[in-house]
Curated annotation (Swiss-Prot):
It comes from Rickettsia prowazekii (strain Madrid E). GO terms for cellular component: plasma membrane; proton-transporting ATP synthase complex. It is a peripheral membrane protein. One of its GO terms (molecular function) is ATP binding. CDD domains: F1-ATPase_gamma (cd12151). This is ATP synthase gamma chain. It is found in: Cell inner membrane. Keywords: ATP synthesis, Cell inner membrane, Cell membrane, CF(1), Hydrogen ion transport, Ion transport, Membrane, Transport. Produces ATP from ADP in the presence of a proton gradient across the membrane. The gamma chain is believed to be important in regulating ATPase activity and the flow of protons through the CF(0) complex. Coiled coil: none annotated.
Length: 288
């Protein structure tokens, strides 16, 4: 009888866990749909800002201020600023592992070339995975849950802008998971500085950059860096929710399979007990 009690307790526990995983699956699905809409709405903006920056790359150095040139020219220093986006929470499969593995491989490759590294880490999981081995490289760490997304973007942007203006970094690379579908997230690294010309865009006249005065290009650079961080952050968040939704769906299905097996085991145990009791009753009756 104690075995039956243990089985019933375990079935109850698994059913309780299944309710939690199902709820998490539904929440992630809802968040994913909402963020996908935001990404779709921002695609046109990203395309426009990329084209404008590509046009600016065609301008000569004398047309740019000294401060502006710093964002387009490769600096003599070999210091790389790596911005790593991960999640605050787990329960999302291989989501964090894939991007952290890529970052570690790139750090090893860059250091072997004699280049220096600075890290800006967004997300608790990334910080926990990198702090032990690369504590000396970490410049900043942001807990996403404690900072509103827009404030986070502004803080990271200011870190980047100051580092470039002070000639502290030569390259800025952002690491994030790019969303393909709920089951597939692509670990992605994107070089955002120095700004380079895109071959996909044709060159247009530079006259219209002068209409708003000498600060127009500086403002565009600010918008460009902001847009790149925002895009990567949205992609990373929707990828996280997709990965968590898939992981929780698998967990829910596994819980359902486990419940079926436990119920079958419970029924067989009950049947064995009943059969044993019947045999004992029949044997007792025959003895009388």
């Amino acid at each position: 009888m104690s075995n039956l009690k243990q089985l019933r307790t375990r079935i109850k526990s698994v059913k309780s866990t299944q309710k939690i995983t199902k709820a998490m699956q539904l929440v992630s699905a809802s968040k994913m749909t909402k963020i996908k809409t935001q990404i779709a709405n921002s695609n046109f903006y990203i395309e426009a800002i990329n084209k404008m920056m590509s046009d600016i790359c065609s301008m000569t150095s004398c047309e740019l201020s000294i401060e502006e040139q710093k964002f387009f020219n490769t600096m003599p220093s070999k210091i790389n600023l790596l911005i790593v986006m991960t999640s605050e929470r787990g329960l999302c499969g291989m989501f964090n592992y894939s991007i952290i593995k890529q970052v570690k491989n790139d750090i090893k490759e860059l250091t072997n070339k004699g280049e220096q590294i600075k890290l800006i880490i967004i997300g608790k999981k990334g910080y926990e995975a990198l702090k032990r081995q690369y504590a000396n490289y970490i410049n900043s760490y942001f807990e996403f849950t404690k900072i509103h997304s827009e404030n986070l973007i502004l803080q990271v942007k200011e870190k980047i802008m100051c580092a470039v203006k002070n000639l502290e970094v030569s390259n800025c690379i952002i690491y994030f998971n790019k969303f393909k579908n709920a089951m597939t997230q692509i670990p992605t690294k994107q070089k955002i500085l120095p700004i380079e010309k895109h071959q996909d865009y044709s060159v247009v006249a530079n006259d219209y950059f002068e209409y708003e005065g000498k600060n127009l290009i500086s403002n565009l650079i600010n918008l460009y860096v902001h847009a790149k961080i925002n895009y990567a952050l949205l992609q990373n968040i929707v990828s996280e929710e997709g990965a968590r939704m898939t992981a929780m769906e698998n967990a829910t299905n596994n819980a359902n399979d486990l419940i079926s097996k436990l119920v079958l085991k419970l029924n067989r145990s009950r049947q064995t007990i009943i059969t044993t009791e019947l045999i004992e009753i029949i044997a007792g009756a025959e003895a009388v």
